[in-house]
Amino acid sequence: TWLLTGTDEHGQKILRTASANDVSPKEWADRLVNDAWKPLLDTVDVANDDFIRTTDERHERGVTAFLQKLYDDGFIYAGEFEGFYCVGCEEYKQPSDLVAGTGAYEGQQVCAIHSIPVEVLAERNYFFRMSDFEQRLLDLYESNPLFIQPESVRNEIISFVKQGLRDLAISRSSFDWGITIPWDSDHVLYVWFDALLNYVTALGYGSDDDEAFRR
């Protein structure tokens, strides 16, 4: 067993919070790591094998390598996107994810999770062809019944995928706090696409020392 933990430090939420505290995003992230997250691990007596930050050079290197491979293989394309964006969730929302605001936000659509107004964003993005993987995933789940456990979650995910996967906007050009898209320096990678890759970058993906990843 190899226990990994760490911090997700990119995105608009960190950028805005840092600005509100008159510090750079990196300085704000450093404060959170050193004053809150690492001390918390000591408090709860967690004996993790590694701690990775998404601002670590090893993570950025691995993410860049992964992204470039997707692009070279034709799984990323440029397009226009407009949608409801929640800064708190750091993701675009469907109309069904919104509720009517109350109090100071009466008359506005707000995020059902954070109860704050969403922003309508329209920008040129790069998209990941997630729709290309719909049948591949269903075939994987069918041929490997134990791949997702428990069964209730497996059934939920299969039902979700069967509804149809849409291509995912994976870049932002309205701010610069993130990992730069390697073929277009005007864009940074969408925070969720970046952060989830820590599970493989911590194992050395994209580096010369990738024995743990290959194992």
What are the language-model segments listed below?
Residues 1-5, 53, 58-62, 110-215:
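Structured secondary-structure scaffolds
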Residues 1-146:
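N-terminal, positively charged nucleic-acid-binding surface of large information/translation enzymes
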